[in-house]
Amino acid sequence: MATLAFDVYGTLINTYGIIDLLNRYVGEEKALQFATLWREKQLEYSFRRSMMNCYEPFYTCTSNALEYCIDSFGVTISRDQYSNLIHRYRSLPVYEDVVTCLSSISERSEVRIYALSNGPQEDVQMLFKDGDIDQYFKDIVSVDEIRKYKPDPAVYQHFLDRTGSGVEDSWLISGNAFDVIGASTFGMNSVWIKRTEHQRLDPWGGRPTYTIQTLSELDALF
């Protein structure tokens, strides 16, 4: 039986779903760059906190990254606007191909579907309920439980321990190259969702078992 570990942010959940608010708050000419830097710093802070053994929940990394971007872009954000941005990040939309993919795969008795996320379980549950996809998941495995962030190998081992699955039967499904490389290096199978042509894998580390462009292609693999 295959056990699928779906990453959340950047795989199921579109982190650029914040653009409409940023268009209003920082201007259309800055919004995309702001959103990109926000995501990059969010991940950077999670990596650094994990390496430094200074764990804080993912929403703290998100908030700290937002503060960095506000300062970096030299924009003025009111307290209400700041709160709106943080709230929106906890209610981001699913990608358009997510529901069809999960609905199809969930019908297969030989596949178990889990989420494996850097986000706290309650935040992921909220996103899944908002996106009407919570019913497809057997459980949500969060790094909060071990206070280490992906791509630390302890996270992938924790997934195996929590789900009782063997490494050879476990598949990470992710749109994030660092996650795919981390899981592949650990020994898991992996599928990289390369949604845009400009995405690249780093020139070292594990390689994905499969590379696809949309989640609609996942159905043919299992």
Regions found by a protein language model. Name each.
Residues 20-21, 37, 64-68, 84, ...:
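Alpha-helical elements of Rossmann-like donor-binding domains used by nucleotide-donor carbohydrate transfer enzymes
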